Amino acid sequence: MKPRNIAIACGVAGVAVGLAAAAGIVYRKQIKSAASLKRLTDYADDYDLYGIDIAYDYDLDRIIAAGVRDDQAYIDAVVAQVLPGVPAHVQAPQFACSAFVAVDAEGRVRTGRNYDFKDDTSALLVRDHPRGGYASIGFAALNNLGDNTPLDSVAGRAAALMGPFAQLDGVNECGVSIAVLTLDSKPCDQDTQRPVINTSLAIRLVLDRAATTQEAVDLLSAYDMHAMAGRDYHFFINDAAGDARVVEWDPRDPDRAFKATPVTQVTNFYACYGDEVLPNQKNGELGHGKERAAAIADVLDAHTGAQDEAVAWKALRAAAQEPNPEDITSNTQWSVVFDNTEPAAAITLRRHWGDIDAFAL
């Protein structure tokens, strides 16, 4: 599988003029960010990989302070910071997937991740260098941002600026990676009088502020969780030391107690109740997809101590899913291998296993 490098740049001047006209005011750093938007692949179905470098500043604490107990409040708080006064359509993200950790003979740590969702989407590679935070690279689904071809309109370019707040996965400069996966339980909506974060903010907080998995666990456990888009979720977190854990909110606890369970792979079932989950079936609130986790485990176990990048891709292929309109967690939209030791990402869209694009942080 040979990595490809395709870059179709948008016109910097056109983006700057268009965004300024749409907003009625020149946002220097927002314009610089929008001008960086590029199409990185060129598939016939127009569902492509795009990339954007985020140059504007944001304040996560201010977004949290605004209150994010419902999805619209979160979207409004983000838009108010990123594009005040500019209409931008964003919908609450939706998520599925498989994730695992792999360690090769030299001790290099990688995270594999399939993003599965029934509706096709373009992907947005987001490079972020937050002021006072860790640089990171990760991916958002452009259908969640309202435009699968964002270079075709000013509104699409403006929506792409929201990428950092709609990411589904990523890795930061410290080697901490995070990926979100959907569950079958009732959406978590904790109310223990702590500050509230939601699914998307959890990803942003970990990438910006956590240097290890333990720091990520400590960070997330300090907040109440509001699950977005009417579904429930958990997070697979890994770091440069290979400390892989699944962070969840216990569906059997009335207060949705926070749990962090060490695992090597997970899909759409509760890791904290993994022994009760059966493959090839729904398991009520405990979830489904254990057969995909078993397929990953079979590949990794066959290469214990030598789980290199090729093995990681083999495991991703073993767990990838074809389209099924009746199953929200079908249809692998992208597969990515994050390097936690030397932070980087390699990605392919929609099971095009011969087309892998590699990106350094």
Regions found by a protein language model. Name each.
Residues 133-143, 271-293:
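A recognition module on extended beta-rich or small alphabeta surfaces enriched in W/G with H and D/E
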Residues 215-231, 235:
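Secretory/export targeting leaders with adjacent low-complexity proregions
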Residues 282-312:
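Long, charge-rich alpha-helical interaction segments
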Residues 230-280:
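Extended amphipathic alpha-helical segments with heptad-repeat/coiled-coil character used for oligomerization
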Residues 204-207, 217-220, 297:
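Non-transmembrane alpha-helical segments in soluble domains
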Residues 2-210, 225, 306-361:
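N-terminal mature-domain region immediately after signal-peptide cleavage
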Residues 212-215, 219, 292, 312:
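General structural feature for long, well-ordered alpha-helical segments within catalytic domains
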